[in-house]
Curated annotation (Swiss-Prot):
Salivary protein with immunosuppressive properties that can modulate blood feeding of ticks on vertebrate species. Inhibits proliferation of bovine peripheral blood mononuclear cells (PBMCs). Inhibits IFN-gamma (IFNG) production by bovine PBMCs. This is Ipis-1. One of its GO terms (cellular component) is extracellular space. SUPFAM superfamilies: Serpins. Glycans are attached at N11, N226. The gene is Ipis-1.
Amino acid sequence: MEASLSNHILNFSVDLYKQLKPSGKDTAGNVFCSPFSIAAALSMALAGARGNTAKQIAAILHTNDDKIHDHFSNFLRKLPSYAPDVALHIANRMYSEQTFHLKAEYTTLLQKSYDSTIKAVDFAGNADRVRLEVNAWVEEVTRSKIRDLLAPGTVDALTSLILVNAIYFKGLWECQFKPSATKPGDFHLTPQTSKTVDMMHQKGDFKMGHCSDLKVTALEIPYKGNKTSMVILLPKDVEGLSVLEEHLTAPKLSALLGGMYVTSDVYLRLPKFKLEQSIGLKDVLMAMGVKDFFTSLADLSGISATGNLCASDVIHKAFVEVNEEGTEAAAANAIRLRYMCLRFPQVINFFVDRPFMFLIHSHDPDVVLFMGSIREL
C-alpha cells in the first residue's frame, strides 16, 4: 500500500517537474515545488470529482482506484514519529461558502483520510477577509515561511470553496557542516561564466549512485533520525542539467535512488541557497491532462449537488533554505537499467559547483516531499 503512494508521487513529481522546468529559449531560472503538497490537494479534489474530471485527475496522479486516499491517510498518521529529529508538518483545510451545501460523504472522507479541517466562511459578503484568513493560516502552519499565498483579487464573491494544503519541513543534517569551513567558491552558471557563492565543506561517508544514461552522479545527505534526506543529482558537465531533465523518467530516478550505496571518504562541497517560488498551476495541470477541472465541463458532483462548480486555479508557493545546520522548506507527483560498479579513488570529490537538481524525500514510505533545480545562485 505504501509502495503505491511512493509510485504515485514519484511519477507525478517527474511529470510535474518536466512542465515547470525552463524550456525553449528560456534556459535560465530555478525550480522548486512540493509534488507531495500538490498531489495531496489534487487527491482531495479527486475525492469529489466524477466522470471525465475524475479520470483526468486520476491519470496525472497515476492511480486508478480510491485507495490513494488510504495511502495518504497512512502516511499522514506516521508524521508524529518523525519528531523530534525533524519537523514535518502537513495541514489540510477546506474553506467553503457558508451558504454552499457540501455532501456529508465528501467532508467525512476529507476529515478521515486527510485530517482536513472544514471551515464555513462568507465569500459572498467579505471575500477579501476570507483571503486574509487563509493567508494567516498558511503562514502559521509554515512557520511564517509562506506568506501571502493568495494575492489580492484571487478570491471574490463568486468563490465557493478553497482547498488548501500546507507543508513545512525543517531538518538538521545528521552530520552538520562547520560554519568555519564555509568559504567563497565558484558556482559555474555556464562554461564561460561563474559566480562567487558561499560554499559549505564536509568530508565523510555518503550514499552515492551513478546513471550513465542521465550522465549524473547522485549523493544523499541524511537528516537527523535517518527518516528523511536530501539527494543531490549532479550532472557531469556545466550544461548537463538540460540533458538530465530531457531524459529523466520515474523508472530511471527510482532505479538511481534504489541503487545508491555507502561510499567512504567523500569530499563534499555544497552551496548555501535559498529559494522561494509562487506558481499558478492551471496551465501546467491542463498541459498534463487535467482540462475539465477548470472549465464548465467540470463534474465535481461528489463535493456538492449544486452545479456550476469548477476550479479557477491551483496556486502553489514553496520555500527552501539550505545552510550548515540543515534544511528548512515549506509549500502551500519497466526500464531495466544497469549501473556501473564504480571504483573510486581514495578520496572522491563531489563538488556541487554547477547547475544541479535536488529532492527531499521521506524513507518510510519513500515519498518525494520537495523537488527542484538550481541554475542560478
